[in-house]
């Protein structure tokens, strides 16, 4: 599972997911990619589940890049605890996703295999996504 080695502050504010991303919107490594079309939080477990789904489908062919990293701590209070008495302890890590962010990239496989592998990965994620290729990506 992905998580930062160390952080400056243990707890963070919720923040807002408005606007467009300023980086990570074009394919940088692979031929095919999975691009988010809405905003949301991706948990480190969801990122890992999607990665496993892709690697199991493509078996030993191709290469996969994970373009997002969960660096925002989510806190939670214990069950049956009264309100107040401070913020809860860090529980899990999430990556903040904005529309247009590239989540995964892939190369070394045919387009049909990549499309199916990324479709399986998209089912594991809580945000809607679309399949993109380097030829239709305007930045490349």
Swiss-Prot record:
PROSITE patterns with a match to the protein in the record: RIBOSOMAL_L16_1, RIBOSOMAL_L16_2
Organism: Pelobacter propionicus (strain DSM 2379 / NBRC 103807 / OttBd1)
Annotated GO biological process: translation
CC annotations in GO: cytosolic large ribosomal subunit
Gene behind the chain: rplP
Presence of keyword DNA damage: no
Keywords: Ribonucleoprotein, Ribosomal protein, RNA-binding, rRNA-binding, tRNA-binding
UniProt xrefs under SUPFAM superfamilies: Ribosomal protein L16p/L10e
An example Gene Ontology molecular-function term: structural constituent of ribosome
Signal peptide: none
Lineage, highest ranks first: Bacteria, Pseudomonadati, Thermodesulfobacteriota, Desulfuromonadia, Desulfuromonadales
Name of the protein this chain belongs to: Large ribosomal subunit protein uL16
């Amino acid at each position: 599972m992905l998580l930062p080695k160390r952080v400056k502050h243990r707890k963070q504010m919720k923040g807002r997911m408005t606007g467009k991303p300023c980086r990570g919107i074009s394919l940088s490594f692979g031929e095919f990619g999975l691009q988010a079309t809405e905003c949301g939080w991706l948990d480190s477990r969801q990122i890992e589940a999607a990665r496993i789904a892709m690697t199991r489908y493509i078996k030993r062919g191709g290469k996969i890049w994970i373009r997002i990293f969960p660096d925002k701590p989510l806190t939670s209070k214990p069950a049956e605890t009264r309100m107040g008495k401070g913020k809860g302890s860090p529980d899990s890590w999430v990556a903040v996703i904005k529309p247009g962010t590239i989540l995964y990239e892939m190369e070394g496989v045919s387009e049909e295999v990549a499309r199916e592998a990324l479709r399986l990965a998209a089912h594991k994620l809580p945000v809607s996504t679309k399949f993109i290729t380097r030829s239709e990506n305007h930045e490349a």
